[in-house]
A protein has these predicted regions:
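Secondary-structure capping and domain/repeat boundary segments
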Residues: 1-177
């Protein structure tokens, strides 16, 4: 907007409306607008980037950290993945890769990963034991029982040997005796 033929000492005319720019926030004028006209002046809009489109310049916002950990104390399954300087409202960065741990299956993250960043967050991997290495949490599998009986009625040649809670694919327990 250009204002011409202004007399020295009159109030500097205000910009009509609000300057807008996609992905940015209007921060003000450079130089600062003088209260009165003292000569020719050009005022340049200054902008602050607003990646999360919340109306606050990114350089004025709190930044957050998202961390993915293996969830295992005293052992390193994988190095933490850490994402820093995240703005509120942006998509939560995903874990890169697939968590793997020998003898276990990955069950998910605790707490569940939020869709958007709202603050600092740590997500710990959760694991289910997988003794038979079939890719299924042992607690979710059907368990089997193997029983050895003497096959004699009315006489006990040997006591029944019962092996319970066996997983598919594990070695059959041997008869003892």
């Amino acid at each position: 907007q250009v204002y011409g033929n202004l007399l020295s000492g009159v109030a500097t005319p205000a910009f009509e409306g609000t300057p807008t720019r996609t992905g940015y926030v209007f921060k003000g004028w450079n130089p600062e607008v003088a209260a009165t006209v003292t000569g020719n002046a050009t005022y340049i809009a200054t902008w602050g980037e607003d990646k999360n489109n919340n109306g606050i310049a990114d350089d004025e916002e709190t930044k957050y950290t998202v961390r993915y950990t293996d969830g295992v104390d005293e052992e390193v399954i994988f190095a933490d993945q850490v994402y820093r300087n995240l703005l509120s409202g942006v998509d939560t960065p995903a874990f890169k890769g697939t968590p793997k741990r020998e003898g276990y299956v990955f069950k998910g993250w605790n707490p569940a990963v939020a869709e958007k960043v709202t603050g600092d967050a740590t997500y710990a991997a959760t694991w289910g034991e997988d003794k038979n290495n079939n890719g299924i949490d042992d607690n979710e599998e059907t368990k089997y029982t193997v029983t050895y009986k003497d096959g004699v009625d009315g006489e006990e040649v040997f006591a029944d040997q019962v092996y319970g809670n066996l997983l598919s694919g594990v070695a059959t327990p041997a008869f003892e005796g």
